Structure formats: C-alpha cells, structure tokens
Amino acid sequence: MRHNFKVIEKKWQKKWEDAKVFEAQDFSDKKKFYGLVEFPYPSGAGMHVGHIKAYSSVEVVSRKRRMEGYNVLFPIGFDAFGLPTENYAIKTGTHPRQITDQNIARFTEQLKRVGFSFDWSRVILSLIHI
C-alpha cells in the first residue's frame, strides 16, 4: 500500500492550523521558549535547500519544547528591503514592492508546505511601504 503524502500532510497541517497548535499564547503561565531563525530575503524565485537546512535545528528544538510543555514563540519574517530585493526587481523588470509581495506569498506557501511550525499569526516584515 502506498501513502499519498501530499494528501496526508495537507490534512494534518490543516488540523494543526485550525487548532492553532503553533501559536504562542499571550500571558501564559507556562515556561517560555523563543526560537528565531534568520529571516529569508524574498528576493529570489523561491526557497532552496539552504533555507531548509538553516531552519531545521531551531524547528526541532521548538517542537521539542512544545512537547515539554513550554509556551513557544517561533515567528517567521521576511527581510524584504535592501540590495538583494532591488537587484532581483531590476533583473526581472518588476517594481520592488510587487516582486516582494509575490515572493513573500511564494516563500510562505513553500515554508508551510515543508511543515515548519512557525507562528504564522506573528509574521515580521522589515519593509517600508512603497
């Protein structure tokens, strides 16, 4: 019997999202743990294996802390200004804000599909409104 991993993963990710399993609780009496990864530059066509490698260790520790009963804050964000974004916009001939919004949407979808347990209710953006 073969498993359809795309269906199974999607099902469980939806259940976890609906149950807000990965959201930190404000004013909780539980011990606290703060996990943070370097925010990606949304200045390319998408994630690569380096992103997965860089985030996996903090992902593992964050999940372990949740299982130990900690209130875990593990936000994600996007470092969406500066030369990488400008260079990618010039390369593609697209306005920096438009390309940034498109890439943030793509990165978000990819990070969710991988199954990282980020607190998506607390996304941090380092961009100025353009």
Segments predicted by a language model, with ranges:
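N-terminal, positively charged nucleic-acid-binding surface of large information/translation enzymes
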Residues: M1-I128
